[in-house]
Amino acid sequence: MKNVGIISLGCHKNTIDSEKMLAILKEKGYNIVNDENKADILIINTCGFIEDAKRESIECIIEMGKLKKHRLKYLIATGCLSERYNKELLKELPELDAVIGTGDFHKIAEVIEKIEKGKTVLEYGHANLLNDEGIQRILTTPNYYAYLKIAEGCSNACSFCIIPRLRGRYRSRKMEDILREAEELVKKGVKELILIAQDTTKYGVDVYKKFMLPQLLKEISKIDGLKWIRLLYAYPDSVTEELVEEIKNNEKIVKYIDIPLQHSHDEVLKRMNRNTNKQKIEEVISRLRSIPYMVIRTTFMVGFPGETEEEFEDLKQFVKEKRFERVGVFTYSREEGTKSYYMKPQIKKSVKIKRQQELMEIQKEISYQHNLSKVGKQLEVLIEGFEDGIYYGRSYMDAPEIDGVVYVKSDKKLKAGDFVVATITDAYEYDLVGEY
């Protein structure tokens, strides 16, 4: 029995693809290992979204290729970098035995059979297909939460983004398939389902000819044993009144939304081809703020081609005024194959980094004030672990890996996956401390 390992880089959609590949291989009789040093076959599920992600993926391939001097026999690259650079990867990285694009990962077992016969395999170019339906998953997340992909690909045409080329056009999954998977995950012990897609709010537009996310949320919430539903990757132009009402009135949906806004200035939004403007964004924020205790996470991009000091100042004022609970700030990455690649003037790297730091400095104080307002109040916390004599976990305000944590002091015996109501005693810029 051969040992197979997988390293999953990039986004949560990649995580799900990795989990499906593991399930396919386990069913074929392969032994799954977490330690790459024990692997006979190693899969690297790459990210190719921005320059830093590409670099990380390539460095990982080169580093893992060194294991071929020892036990490792075959090295396979899958994911977005493979879809984007396919033939180039095989040519430039001789460590690789196979390259598989985003629409072909379900062929992983066949590919391994071919490389074991001495063939070098290249499979790509099918990013527009939705051909992984019904494949089981081996969860790589803790057993109490899981990501649930509701759609694949993207039909937005943001001028800075390569994703439509790497993941294909937007394809919603059928509601019955999503619900079946959600039920299976909850049966396995999952208490929090985190809904993801390139754009969760457009769910259903292609298949059902209308926005169906509110209905999907309603149906998922009927699953017994499910505690939290969390929504990531919402787009501002598709946040409807119906969706806001569903979030507001459905007890299982945490009052949290991740909604990448990218910028506040109309001219920058126009150059980004974001299909919205500042006024519409403000209306969406106002609608979301009508939900009691709502937490809004967003991301902004600084240093987009042509971003003037005036436009950046507008963004700074916007962040100060809107006081988002959670903010991520990225510097623009110039990517071949995007419209913005050819835009002028391109902003110097030093200016981009300076703007990123300025914006994060503003947000740091806002985040601290938000956290300070929780002191003395009670928060439900999902316990995730125990370290240095203290428990830690997440409240409804925190998505895994990207947000802060709540440290919980307790004499009681708690385990990962437990929900407790903690009294908050202290606050930091991104984390809270409580007692139970």
Curated annotation (Swiss-Prot):
- Write down the top EC class of this protein: transferase
Per UniProt, [4Fe-4S] cluster 2 binds at C154, C158, C161
The protein's matches in CDD domains, at most eight in alphabetical order, are given as:
Radical_SAM
Q: Where is the TRAM domain?
A: 372-436
Q: How is the cofactor bound?
A: Binds 2 [4Fe-4S] clusters. One cluster is coordinated with 3 cysteines and an exchangeable S-adenosyl-L-methionine.
A biological process (GO) of this protein is: tRNA modification
Primary subcellular site in the record, as a coarse category: cytoplasm
Any one GO MF term held by the record is:
aspartic acid methylthiotransferase activity
Against SMART domains, the record matches this protein to: Elp3 (SM00729)
Query: Reaction catalysed by this chain?
Result: L-aspartate(89)-[ribosomal protein uS12]-hydrogen + (sulfur carrier)-SH + AH2 + 2 S-adenosyl-L-methionine = 3-methylsulfanyl-L-aspartate(89)-[ribosomal protein uS12]-hydrogen + (sulfur carrier)-H + 5'-deoxyadenosine + L-methionine + A + S-adenosyl-L-homocysteine + 2 H(+)
Q: Determine if Kinase is one of this entry's keywords.
A: no
Role description: Catalyzes the methylthiolation of an aspartic acid residue of ribosomal protein uS12.
Q: Which NCBIfam families match?
A: 30S ribosomal protein S12 methylthiotransferase RimO (TIGR01125), MiaB/RimO family radical SAM methylthiotransferase (TIGR00089)
Q: What is the name of this protein?
A: Ribosomal protein uS12 methylthiotransferase RimO
